[in-house]
From Swiss-Prot:
Family as reported in the entry's similarity comment: Belongs to the universal ribosomal protein uS19 family.
Name of the featured protein: Small ribosomal subunit protein uS19
Protein keywords: Ribonucleoprotein, Ribosomal protein, RNA-binding, rRNA-binding
Listed Pfam families: Ribosomal_S19 (PF00203)
BP GO annotations: ribosomal small subunit assembly; translation
NCBIfam families per the UniProt record, alphabetical: rpsS_bact
Keyword rRNA-binding belongs to the record: yes
Molecular function per GO: rRNA binding; structural constituent of ribosome
Length: 94
C-alpha cells in the first residue's frame, strides 16, 4: 500500500538538511545514512549517499531516474550465493 497523498513523501530531516547544506556550499562528499525508507528527492541528484545494508554502507550515486524511489531499493540486504552444487557425496546419498 502506498503512502497517503496528504502526508507527502518521507525523507529523514537530518539527511535532507545535509543535502541542502551541501547544495548551498557546492560541496561533494559521501553522506552516510541508515534511513533506507527515505524517498529520493530532486535535490539529491548528483550526490553519493552511503546507504546501510545491515552490515556495511553501500555507496549509491543518485541520478534523475532514481527520483521518487526509496534509498533502500539500491542497497540490497541479501546476497544470493547460488544453490548447492551436485557433488559426488550428494548423488551417492540418493
Amino acid at each position: 500500500m502506498s503512502r497517503s497523498l496528504k502526508k507527502g513523501p518521507y525523507c529523514d530531516a537530518r539527511l535532507l538538511a545535509k543535502i541542502e547544506k551541501m547544495n548551498e556550499t557546492g560541496e561533494k562528499r559521501v553522506i552516510k545514512t541508515w534511513s533506507r525508507a527515505s524517498t529520493i528527492f530532486p535535490q539529491m541528484v548528483g550526490h553519493t549517499i552511503a546507504v546501510h545494508d545491515g552490515r556495511k554502507h553501500v555507496p549509491v550515486y543518485i541520478t534523475e531516474d532514481m527520483v521518487g524511489h526509496k534509498l533502500g531499493e539500491f542497497a540490497p540486504t541479501r546476497i544470493f550465493r547460488g544453490h548447492g552444487a551436485h557433488t559426488e557425496r550428494s548423488t551417492a546419498l540418493k
